[in-house]
Swiss-Prot record:
NCBIfam families: codY_Gpos, PRK04158.1. It holds the Pfam family CodY. It is found in: Cytoplasm. Residues 207-226 bind DNA. Its main location: cytoplasm. It comes from the Bacteria. DNA-binding global transcriptional regulator which is involved in the adaptive response to starvation and acts by directly or indirectly controlling the expression of numerous genes in response to nutrient availability. During rapid exponential growth, CodY is highly active and represses genes whose products allow adaptation to nutrient depletion. This is Global transcriptional regulator CodY.
Length: 260
């Protein structure tokens, strides 16, 4: 049997994975699955708003109603509010406790069900909650040590993810500002007209038609598109006689045009 140190290493090895390796929809499924295997329990991770970030169900303990929470990836507001008031790990909560993960209709089926809740912090902020549960058998002190470590690891990853997202937002904003600063008034007018033609973030357009409508030359539109493409704001592809296919890859340009 793996000892506590070996189990700890399995959990902390998650930190060696880059943020880019996290799944888009349920980024912490791997952490939840690893914790569930190591501690022999069910596990889930939610953010501060109750959105599901990852889960692992080793054992069937829930009803269709509760399974729906996992399918919709959103926990009930009442439960989320109650969990947010837990500031330190609450271990081995019975099925009678308001924080039990076991549904009311399952209390008779799993009378010995136990839930443990650990808050997730990062940078001094509450970022979410880690929840684990069993049909029976208390969580030992070793189990709880692993829970504390897991919540810390997830907190670090959540903080890193927030930092990377912020850096990406700043990078995109900077790229848009630099691109806008290279455009003349006529080119800005052309860009505004072009993007208003798109169906969402992409679509087909004909430069000559737009040029005639707003009273500028076709070359102004071509120059504006080249500048945006070189700045990584858009992607374009010639469709020959059908015009040009355009796709916006930096949506910050839309916000900037609102100021125009």
């Amino acid at each position: 049997m793996p000892n506590l140190l070996q189990k700890t290493r399995k959990i902390t090895s998650i930190l060696q994975r880059s943020v880019d390796s996290l799944e888009t929809e349920l980024p912490y499924n791997t952490m939840a699955s690893r914790l569930a295997d190591i501690i022999d329990c069910n596990a889930c991770i939610i953010n501060g708003g109750g959105s599901l970030l990852g889960y692992a169900m080793k054992y069937k303990t829930n009803t269709d109603r509760v399974e729906e929470f996992f399918e919709t990836r959103q926990f009930p507001d009442a439960y989320v509010k109650a969990a947010s008031r837990v500031y330190d790990t609450e271990a081995n909560l019975s099925v009678e406790n308001e924080l039990t993960i076991f549904p009311v209709e399952s209390k008779d089926i799993y009378p010995d069900g136990l839930t443990t809740i650990a808050p997730i912090y990062g940078g001094g902020m509450r970022l979410g909650t880690l929840i684990i549960w069993r049909n029976d058998n208390e969580f030992s002190d070793d189990d709880l040590v692993l829970v504390e470590i897991s919540s810390t690891v997830v907190g670090i990853q959540l903080l890193n993810l927030q930092t990377e997202n912020l850096e990406e937002t700043i990078r995109k904003q900077t790229a848009v500002n630099m691109a806008i600063n290279t455009l003349s008034y006529s080119e800005m007018k052309a860009v505004a007209a072009i993007l208003s033609e798109l169906d969402g973030n992409e679509g087909r357009l004909t430069a000559s038609v737009i040029a005639d409508r707003i009273g500028i030359t076709r070359s102004v539109i071509v120059n504006a598109l080249r500048k945006l493409e070189s700045a990584g704001i858009i992607e374009s592809r010639s469709l020959g006689m059908k015009g040009t296919y355009l796709k916006v890859i930096n949506e910050g340009i839309f916000d900037k045009l609102k100021e125009f």
